[in-house]
């Protein structure tokens, strides 16, 4: 019994420390590869553009359709892309603002996920997500 508990604790530790991996969202890695730029910040900017285009495609849909699923995976790729920023960039005030945008995007996406089947709410949250992505991109441009 103790061996099972130890094995379970070890597996939870490994999953918890995997930080920048695609264990639960394997397609997010594909989007991160597609958006790969010369730097971590450029990759994040490419992902924000990709997400804006996908958010526009997801408008008018319902549930977890293809565009919404793509947006979901791109969202996780963007969150993980924060690990690709250099130490010097991470110490800037603009990066702190980018982290704030990340938190705001997370809150918006949670609400978007909640209302994925409620059409008027879904489109409103997609619009809000697009605005926040534009603000994030502007912030990232100051870091570069």
Which sequence ranges carry the predicted segments?
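Long, amphipathic, charge-rich alpha-helical segments that form helical bundles/coiled-coils
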Residues: 70-125, 132
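Bacterial N-terminal signal peptides that target proteins for export
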Residues: 1-8
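Bacterial N-terminal signal peptides
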Residues: 8-16
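Amphipathic, soluble alpha-helical interaction motifs
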Residues: 53-57, 81, 88, 111, ...
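Immediate post-signal-peptide N-terminus of mature secreted/exported proteins
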Residues: 20-73
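Short, low-complexity, Pro/Ser/Thr/Gly-rich segments in the mature regions of secreted, periplasmic
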Residues: 129-144
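Mature extracytoplasmic/luminal segments of secretory-pathway proteins
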Residues: 17-20, 80
